[in-house]
Regions:
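Beta-strand repeat architectures
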Residues: 1-11, 17-31, 39-111, 115-140, ...
């Protein structure tokens, strides 16, 4: 497992490989630029994980090559910031009890196309998913946003545009 626990900004240009996981734990910003093939989960507990390449699950990208299962991309208090060109990915994600943020600030829209259910880490309590960014294209979230034993609130901030296409059932709005 690789854990980044820094309060400043750092760029990791090398590819990460193996079966381990990656965790963004510090309040700083970590930018991953390597085409990584690690197959463990990516967890963002604090700060910002900035990437320019998101592929479908199972393919190498800045967040590894884990499957598209929601347990393999976890937002739990931190931000996944997309800074690349227009892209579609079938990756689902989970939101923990500390909430999480998707930031679409690339040169093109980011489209999360998987229509499965968003995952949850921690079964009770209120969690907030924040959608933000500066990209004014139609950034899309097709995943179903539910509650799963708690309430899931949804917040939109920033100048970017987000389109929700899932059959959402969350009660925390």
């Amino acid at each position: 497992s690789l854990v980044i626990n820094r309060s400043d900004a750092i760029t990791l240009a090398n590819a990460i490989s193996g079966s381990g996981s990656f965790t963004q734990a510090g309040a700083g910003t970590t930018t991953l630029t390597g085409s990584s093939s690690y197959t463990g989960s990516t967890t963002i507990n604090a700060g910002v994980l900035s990437v320019a390449v998101l592929t479908n699950g199972g393919s190498s990208s800045n967040v590894g090559a884990a499957t598209s299962d929601a347990a393999n991309l976890v937002l739990n208090g931190g931000t996944l910031k997309y800074t690349g060109a227009a892209v579609s990915t079938d990756r689902l994600f989970s939101v923990g009890t500390n909430g999480g943020t998707l930031d679409a600030s690339g040169t093109g829209a980011v489209n999360f196309t998987n229509t499965g259910s968003m995952g949850f880490n921690g079964q009770s309590g209120i969690r907030t998913l924040t959608l933000t960014g500066t990209n004014t294209g139609d950034n899309t979230l097709a995943a179903v946003i539910g509650d799963n034993g708690g309430a899931t609130a949804l917040t939109k901030s920033g100048t970017g545009t987000w389109v929700l296409t899932g059959n959402n059932s969350n009660s925390g709005i």
